[in-house]
Amino acid sequence: MAARCVRLARGSLPAFALSLRSSPRLLCTAAKQKNNGQNLEEDAGQNEQKTDLPSTEKTLMEEKVKLEEQLKETMEKYKRALADTENLRQRSQKLVEEAKLYGIQGFCKDLLEVADILEKATQCVPQEEIRDDNPHLKSLYEGLVMTEVQIQKVFTKHGLLRLNPLGAKFDPYEHEALFHTPVEGKEPGTVALVNKVGYKLHGRTLRPALVGVVKGA
């Protein structure tokens, strides 16, 4: 049975080959159909890829814009944080410096009372009594003057400046007016009398000078 099939196949091969030689168009048509099928599949795949590509690009662009906005917001927060930190550092440094400068303010105010007493004691000594034939009073007076000079040197060393504005223009930040009075030959608004000297500590008024101010006519 198998041998018969083989003989039949061998017998039909020449006829099949002859039909192919006599009909080459069949081969070309089949090949074209095959190629066309492959091309259609490739075109469909490319079209599908082209359709997906714009969507992907759009998504990427949206993500890019979102990330850029987040980055911008983060940088702004970072800059604000840096500015706040710098402001805090400067304020803290200023507070420390002021504490160093003005920490002795209360102590200085107490010393001013001592300086006032020394000044009054010196002024109370009659100048006509300061003579060589009165050595005790002369020595006492000279001792008071030396002490007053020395305490003013200490004040200056620590930034404490004496204010004696006699004849100067009245300054409400440094002077306190006790009264106003017309004074002949004096410019209105100037200090005519200093009742009590004032003091400034590192440029800040520690105690205003108590003064009388010339009043305009």
From Swiss-Prot:
Q: Which GO terms describe its biological process?
A: protein folding; protein import into mitochondrial matrix
Which parts of the sequence carry N6-succinyllysine? K94, K120, K215
Recite the UniProt keywords alphabetically.
Acetylation, Chaperone, Mitochondrion, Transit peptide
Chief location bin: mitochondrion
The record's listing under InterPro entries reads: GrpE, GrpE_coiled_coil, GrpE_head
**Where is this protein localized, as stated in its record?**
Mitochondrion matrix
Which residues are annotated as modified residue N6-acetyllysine in the UniProt record? Answer: K94, K100, K215
Transit peptide extent on chain: 1-27
Q: Does the keyword Chaperone belong to this entry? A: yes
What SUPFAM superfamilies does UniProt report for this protein, alphabetically?
Answer: Coiled-coil domain of nucleotide exchange factor GrpE (SSF58014), Head domain of nucleotide exchange factor GrpE (SSF51064)
Q: Which family does it belong to?
A: Belongs to the GrpE family.
PANTHER family attached here? GRPE PROTEIN, GRPE PROTEIN HOMOLOG 1, MITOCHONDRIAL
Briefly state the protein's biological role: Essential component of the PAM complex, a complex required for the translocation of transit peptide-containing proteins from the inner membrane into the mitochondrial matrix in an ATP-dependent manner. Seems to control the nucleotide-dependent binding of mitochondrial HSP70 to substrate proteins.
Quaternary state and interactors:
Probable component of the PAM complex at least composed of a mitochondrial HSP70 protein, GRPEL1 or GRPEL2, TIMM44, TIMM16/PAM16 and TIMM14/DNAJC19. Binds to HSP70, HSC70 and HSJ1B.
* Protein name as it appears in the record: GrpE protein homolog 1, mitochondrial
- Source organism of the structure: Bos taurus (Bovine)
